[in-house]
């Protein structure tokens, strides 16, 4: 069968839920037996998300093959249970880089290189290649930003051309836009949505489906009004409204038969779909079957924007739903723990578990170390991720080994005891973008340890994103003092450490949250939540 494409655009404002919509449609298609992938288009000039501030962009999601990508790829993976690749995130930076490289190589044979056709052709080539490399029958394409943004215009033109080239029944458009509810008048206002569709039609794109994003379900009158002014069938107007968890969205869409209608429009067979396990998971997330509520402190330096740690948050929810407890997340800015006037007991005294989050740089590091010490000394279940792992080593070296000046060379290049140091392969690296130790790496687990018990096997693969490692010169004295190295890389890097004397004290250089799935939680997060819940 010919490749099929579902292009999702957004209107009125950003963060309206395009990523969740794409992930939900993808999940419902996959559960019908179709091979599906999803492509996120980001119109910014950055080549990737790797050097962007989390406050600007949210989490940097790392794929199995080591790409630093938009957090929407995390939504795709979690909902669809399909691994994304570096080809699934297309940025304007990547597109222009390839076009300029081809021009320098003489590939355009002396032509004047222009947005049309050269840039738009490159965009289409990259979309098609992502579909091909993932063996997809159906490819979802999410165009970041909103219709009308100047940065998005070449991408919208490219997908307009894609429909012309691939055929009327092989490329369809789904447009999602805000439908604002005015509490004063008690009505849903559709005018902004209408204008966003008018803008799309000016570009030459007629939506096949419209998803109205509102606080409440769309009533029949509102749907008829939208249909009239957008030239879209009434039964192709779908409602996406506020719910307790984004994992409910596929259930809402399925109840309105959106995917069945999409398959009909694409001239594809509709198939039976079983959402029993998903509905059970959603009920557990909502706490319907919860045995108890647990308080988890998340200590980091970007906690004012929760999306900076979205995969960790979701991994906690997955593990909690799996064992039937409801997590209450307490976000703590690590800099708030650095002041001597703050009483750690007041902040951490009522939590059942502590996670020290990833991050870079010296800001807030001492606050994280205080949280780690508090967890270790008060025997509170603890999980350290990436930088949290490295600072666990620093804390242990200072407070157990008595190396009071121990530190990471990232924080203090001249530290007397550099227990964390730059990876050998990083010492001659001068560029920041795409140069860390990235992607899935082999971890060899030590039998008889907590890590081995959690994973249930000797060799595992987890994703990474770091430049620093535990200094091999200090491993022996750390182990002599009671720290257990339970996981190492093929070349001997320390990957996982634990303290068997504590209820649960585990830290890892990896990011196991990136591989956590709703119905298949990360083993490390599952072990942590079990310890927190005392189950």
Swiss-Prot record:
Gene Ontology biological-process annotations: 'de novo' CTP biosynthetic process; CTP biosynthetic process; pyrimidine nucleobase biosynthetic process
MF-aspect GO terms: ATP binding; CTP synthase activity; glutaminase activity; identical protein binding; metal ion binding
Enzyme type, top EC level: ligase
Annotated spans, Amidoligase domain: 1-268
Alphabetical list of InterPro entries matching this protein: Class_I_gatase-like (IPR029062), CTP_synthase (IPR004468), CTP_synthase_N (IPR017456), GATASE (IPR017926), GATase1_CTP_Synthase (IPR033828), P-loop_NTPase (IPR027417)
Domain Glutamine amidotransferase type-1: from-to ranges: 302-535
Protein name per the record: CTP synthase
């Amino acid at each position: 069968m010919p490749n099929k494409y579902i292009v999702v655009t957004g209107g009125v404002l950003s963060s309206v839920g395009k990523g969740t919509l794409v992930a939900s449609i993808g999940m419902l298609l996959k559960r019908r037996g179709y091979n599906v992938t999803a492509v996120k288009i980001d119109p910014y000039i950055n080549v990737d998300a790797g050097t962007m501030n989390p406050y600007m962009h949210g989490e940097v999601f790392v794929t199995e093959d080591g790409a630093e990508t938009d957090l929407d790829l995390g939504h795709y993976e979690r909902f669809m249970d399909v691994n994304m690749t570096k080809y699934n995130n297309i940025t304007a930076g990547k597109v222009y880089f390839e076009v300029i490289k081809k021009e320098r190589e003489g590939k355009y044979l002396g032509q004047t290189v222009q947005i049309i056709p050269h840039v738009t052709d490159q965009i289409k080539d990259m979309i098609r290649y992502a579909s091909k490399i993932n063996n997809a029958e159906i490819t979802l394409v999410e165009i970041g930003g909103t219709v009308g943004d100047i940065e998005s215009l070449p991408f919208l033109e490219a997908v307009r051309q894609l429909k012309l080239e691939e055929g009327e029944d092989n490329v369809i458009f789904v447009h999602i836009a805000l439908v604002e509810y005015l509490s004063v008048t008690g009505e849903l206002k559709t005018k902004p949505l209408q204008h966003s569709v008018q803008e799309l039609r000016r570009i030459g794109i007629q939506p096949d489906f419209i998803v109205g994003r509102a606080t409440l379900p769309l009533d029949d009158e509102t749907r008829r009004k939208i249909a009239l002014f957008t030239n879209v069938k009434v039964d192709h107007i779908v409602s996406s409204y506020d719910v307790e968890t984004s994992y409910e969205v596929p259930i809402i869409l399925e109840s309105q038969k959106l995917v069945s209608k999409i398959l009909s429009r694409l001239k594809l067979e509709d198939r039976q779909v079983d959402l029993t396990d998903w509905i059970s998971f959603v009920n557990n997330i909502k706490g319907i079957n919860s045995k108890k509520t647990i308080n988890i402190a998340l200590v980091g330096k970007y906690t004012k924007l929760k999306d900076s740690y979205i995969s960790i948050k979701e991994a906690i929810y997955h593990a909690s739903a799996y064992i039937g407890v409801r997590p209450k997340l307490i976000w703590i800015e690590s800099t708030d723990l650095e002041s001597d006037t703050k009483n750690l007991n007041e902040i951490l005294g009522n939590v059942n578990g502590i996670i020290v989050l990833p991050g870079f740089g010296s800001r807030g590091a001492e606050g994280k170390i205080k949280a780690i010490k508090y967890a270790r000394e008060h025997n509170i279940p603890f999980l350290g991720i990436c930088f949290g792992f490295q600072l666990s080593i620093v804390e242990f070296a200072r407070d157990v080994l008595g190396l009071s000046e121990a530190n990471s060379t990232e924080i203090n290049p001249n530290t007397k005891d550099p227990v964390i140091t730059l990876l050998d392969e990083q010492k001659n690296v001068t560029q920041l973008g795409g140069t860390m130790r990235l992607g899935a790496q082999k971890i060899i687990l030590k039998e008889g340890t907590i890590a081995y018990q959690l994973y249930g096997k000797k060799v595992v693969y987890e994703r990474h994103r770091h430049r620093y490692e535990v200094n091999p010169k200090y491993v022996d004295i750390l182990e002599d003092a009671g720290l257990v190295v339970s996981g190492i890389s093929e070349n001997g890097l320390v990957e996982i450490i634990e303290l068997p004397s504590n209820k649960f004290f585990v830290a890892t250089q990896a990011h196991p949250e990136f591989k956590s799935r709703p119905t298949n939680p990360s083993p490390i997060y599952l072990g942590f939540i079990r310890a927190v819940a005392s189950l």
